[in-house]
Amino acid sequence: MTRDAVICEPVRTPIGRYGGMFASLTAVELGVAALKGLLERTGVAPEQVQDVILGHCYPNSEAPAIGRVVALDAGLPVTVPGMQVDRRCGSGLQAVIQACLQVRSGDNDLVVAGGAESMSNVAFYSTDMRWGGARGGVQIHDGLARGRTTAGGQFYPVPGGMLETAENLRREYCITRAEQDELAVRSHQSAVAAQRSGVLAEEIIPVTVTSRKGETVIDTDEHPRADTTVEALAKLKPVLLKQDPDATVTAGNSSGQNDAASMCIVTTAEKAAELGLRPLVRMVSWGSAGVAPDVMGIGPVPATEAALAKAGLQLGDIDLIELNEAFAAQALAVMKEWKFGEADFERTNVRGSGISLGHPVGATGGRMLATLARELDHRQARYGLETMCIGGGQGLAAVFERVAA
C-alpha cells in the first residue's frame, strides 16, 4: 500500500560565491551545519532518522558516500545509514524524490534528504599517475571544468561545455542578448527583494566560519547583487566570443559556481503529527527525461510533461514554478516552449534563482524546494513545480501540493 510522503522544514545554508565566504569549508562541513540546524529546528532526535540521502556532484575520496559521512560528523548514531546521489544539477531534488519513494513504500518512516556542494573546493585530479604515467608526463584535470565537457560520454561530446549548450539554445530559439540580460536583472531584483523582506531568512540555517580573526556567523546569501543593471550586464564580454562572433552568454546572465547545503525531512503525515512536525507539501509526482547533450538546457520541458501527466495536471494548474536558471538563454528557451507570457513571470522564480542566488549544483534542488514549499504556504496556493536542466542532456521535475495546516 502506497503512502503519501510529506516534506517538513526544508532548509539550507546561505549560498556562498565561488572562492567567497565559504571557501574554507568543505561540502561535508556545510552539510553538517545544515543537518545539525535541521534537527535543532525540528527537535527530531538523531536516532529517529532512518536514512540520510544527499545529492553531491563533485565527490572525492575525502568524503565517500557523503550522506553517510555527514550523518556521522553531525553526531547521528552509527546505526543511521547514508548515501550519495548524483544526477548532476538535479541531484538535490533526486535525493528528495528517493527519500519520498522510500517513505511511500513503507521501507522508512523518516528520512533526511538534500544535498551539499563546495564548488570552491572541487579537486584537481590525474588519470595518468597510477601506472607510471610520469614517464611521458602527467596531465592534471580541473574536476569542475572537466565534468562539463565529458557529461555527454564518448559519442556526444560537448567541447564548449555547458556554455556551448546555452549558445545552441540561444541560436535555435532566437533569443537575444538583451532578453538574457533582462532576465538576469529580474532574477537579482527578486532575490534582493526577498533578502530585504526577510522571506529568505526563514529557510536559512546560519553557518559559523572560523578564521584567524575569530568566528563569524553567516546568515545571508552572498551571490545576489543589488546593483545589477541591464546597462552593466551589457558591458560584459560573451565567454565564447572567440569561437563564435554571435555569442551572447556571459558571466552575468549565467548561474554562479557556488557553495551551500540543503536539507529537509521526508516522512508521513502520521509520523509528522507524532513528532510535532508541520508538513508543508507532499510530493504528487515526478518525472525525468533525456535530451540531446548539446541542448541539455531544454530538459525541463519533457521532464515537466512527464511529471504533469502522472499528476493529471496541466501547466496552467501550477501556481508556482521553480525553474532553475542555469543560463538565462536556457531558461528562456524552456519558457518559449511553454509559451509563457509576461504574466507567467509572476509565478516563476519569484524569489530569484540560479543567476541571482547561485547554483551549488548538488544542493540546488533542496534550495529550490525550500523556497517553493514556503512560498506555497505564504500564498496559500495549491500546486508547485520544481524543475531543472541537467548537464549531459537530462531534465528532472517534481510536482508538490501544499499541505493545509
Predicted features, each with a name:
Residues R12-T13, S24-V28, V32, R41, ...:
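N-terminal extracellular/periplasmic Venus flytrap/periplasmic-binding protein-like
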Residues L110-E172:
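Flexible glycine-/small-residue-enriched beta->alpha junction loops
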Residues H56-V111, Y156-M162, D227-G256, E337-R367, ...:
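Conserved catalytic cysteine-centered active-site region
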Residues A23-V111, A116-R135, I204-T220, L315-V334, ...:
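Conserved beta-ketoacyl condensing-enzyme motif
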Residues R87-E117, R170-V199, M263-E270, M335-K336, ...:
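Active-site-proximal alpha-helical scaffold in enzymes
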